[in-house]
Amino acid sequence: MSIEKVRAAFAALEIADRIRELDESSATVALAAQALGCEPRRIAKTLSFQGKEQPILIVAAGDGKIDNHRFKERFGVKAKMLAAEEVPEKIGHAVGGVCPFAVNEGVEVYLDDSLRRFETVFPACGSSNSAIDTISKFTCAICSRLFRACVRSFHLA
């Protein structure tokens, strides 16, 4: 199970107890905000795209939008989201639980500047009913430290 991979990785940082498993679905920004009792923009949504060679994850605020022109400028390819059936194999998490933690080798993770507006954000933790409340700067640190992700901050829209 994907959440177990995240839990094991977080155990190494002694933060596994901060994972929140919810009684209701958190598979979308709206559902996660409702389940967590926060504004939708504070949900750190993780979007899956196909890069030139490897998959790309972009973590953005719940109200963030992808600017197709800027995406192509930055990555050299048109913004094309992975099909739902491709996501588990290419990323390591199923749609609804995709997160920047414990992803497959070679997946590049990018954090959008839209996250900087908030002291804390809520990314998923590998399942469609989980989240962790985290300081946005900490999200960047655990992505780069634990999972050797290519973490960059940039503004897409």
Predicted features and spans:
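Extended, low-hydrophobicity, polar/charged segments
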Residues: 1-157
